[in-house]
Amino acid sequence: MTTWSLRRRPARTLGLLLLVVLGFLVLRRLDWSTLVPLRLRHRQLGLQAKGWNFMLEDSTFWIFGGSIHYFRVPREYWRDRLLKMKACGLNTLTTYVPWNLHEPERGKFDFSGNLDLEAFVLMAAEIGLWVILRPGPYICSEMDLGGLPSWLLQDPGMRLRTTYKGFTEAVDLYFDHLMSRVVPLQYKRGGPIIAVQVENEYGSYNKDPAYMPYVKKALEDRGIVELLLTSDNKDGLSKGIVQGVLATINLQSTHELQLLTTFLFNVQGTQPKMVMEYWTGWFDSWGGPHNILDSSEVLKTVSAIVDAGSSINLYMFHGGTNFGFMNGAMHFHDYKSDVTSYDYDAVLTEAGDYTAKYMKLRDFFGSISGIPLPPPPDLLPKMPYEPLTPVLYLSLWDALKYLGEPIKSEKPINMENLPVNGGNGQSFGYILYETSITSSGILSGHVHDRGQVFVNTVSIGFLDYKTTKIAVPLIQGYTVLRILVENRGRVNYGENIDDQRKGLIGNLYLNDSPLKNFRIYSLDMKKSFFQRFGLDKWSSLPETPTLPAFFLGSLSISSTPCDTFLKLEGWEKGVVFINGQNLGRYWNIGPQKTLYLPGPWLSSGINQVIVFEETMAGPALQFTETPHLGRNQYIK
């Protein structure tokens, strides 16, 4: 039997010698040259948990993993990011699978383009990486509703993440389709998937003791035969245990290492230790700072985890971007939605550039590798294109007539229950409510998440979680009351995920009397939404545009397109679309000040740029080589 172990630089040998005394490891450099997907031909056993060690076939194995989410990275850059992972000395890719993106409507599945899971997994195998798949159904991942599809919320009695029949029936149908794609990619079928995670951090939710056994059985019944794992933070670990499933832990600091050495052992006895999520940074929320974690602290903690005889996964190795409206939110004391960038202060930047963390971790993993690491790929070029001044304009009020007949309802309808998208409701974007009023007074109601209130076309303020009332002034003549409501992102973590319906929730009141007879417009801003606005629908940009509005301009590129960062100085809040691709939201409250624009989404020649601005338009759009993610705050 081949036995692998670690030999490291003298400064770190003391801790390893202690492990030798304890019998955990036998010192020798790791030689990974034959233990890669394309070279391991004779497969029988797969990844196993035996005593303190993982075993892959007859070899002791350490998982040195990193997380990259295919859905947050342009497909054209998957190879670049995976090669950089391999060059850092890692041997395993981990990724979530987002149900909401793969099944946007009941029974209609999308695994094309940037959602081609199979192509991503097979590319990892080609590059020499094993794969741990995290298919949920709930994934958290700072995604809208934790990756669950919003159409589940059409059921007024829905209990997400439980064995409630309405939920499990939907999971079963989704898993029927998903696992038919995943099963052939497993290790025992010649693929790179060596382990599959059961749900995600359920111990912190823990509302139904029958739920985790149900998910485990749902995976196994559909042909999942590889090692099963759970993943929990320190608060949920003891409650997230499932019989026959290996428990792993999520943490960030050296102060939490006792969870590895003591708590994990107390929970499941003699089993391999695994940090499924070592958080290399953290996500950001609108209105907050840009969270960063010092590279020396990262190296110190990673070294301590490995010295403790544990496998590790770096979450995130490369964060990428919350393109479109996929970002999630948190709502404990206050509602806070996540920014567009998922840079995460990870090992690679949002644009895939190297960081001090990358260099230090590459040295570290290189020091315990028995073979030289492959050279890191060259950096991708960036380009500060010339500023772009929009020349055409379409106010939201003028755009409404091109959207077809509005939905008419006596009472407000929340976003998820709108009769659109084949009966699946609206998942993302904005929703506009209109009704007629004949008096002034106090307007009140529950708006999720942010509603701009208009009398005719004049903005009078906002309603949100903190501001639930607003004074409506007296206006002579026919008066239309309008509320433009934005879904800023459904909560992805916490106990209140069942309550994530968006738009107007319940009645809207004027002087405590419910308003009636609404006209409702679905503004999902998909590609099909903009196809209704031919060039003949736009007009020249006036000196003082009526807002909210769409602004149209063109970016001319004469050479091969490169990555760039879009800067919107003078603009306040909205969304940017390039050649039909939704780059995501911008907001001048920060911390994020630039939007990442991948080169593959541009073309040589003319590129169409559309900005939807809610409140204040700037003079131009600027492009820079350098991202600006906001004022730094060190994670403690």
Swiss-Prot record:
Keyword Signal: yes
InterPro entries reported for this sequence: B-gal_1-like, BetaGal1-like_ABD1, BetaGal_gal-bd, Galactose-bd-like_sf, Gly_Hdrlase_35_cat, Glyco_hydro_35_CS, Glycoside_Hdrlase_35, Glycoside_hydrolase_SF
Highest taxon of the lineage: Eukaryota
GO cellular-component term (any): extracellular region
Record-given protein name: Beta-galactosidase-1-like protein 2
Pfam families linked to this entry: BetaGal_ABD_1, BetaGal_gal-bd, Glyco_hydro_35
Record EC number: 3.2.1.-
UniProt record similarity statement: Belongs to the glycosyl hydrolase 35 family.
Record key words, sorted: Glycosidase, Hydrolase, Secreted, Signal
Species name: Homo sapiens (Human)
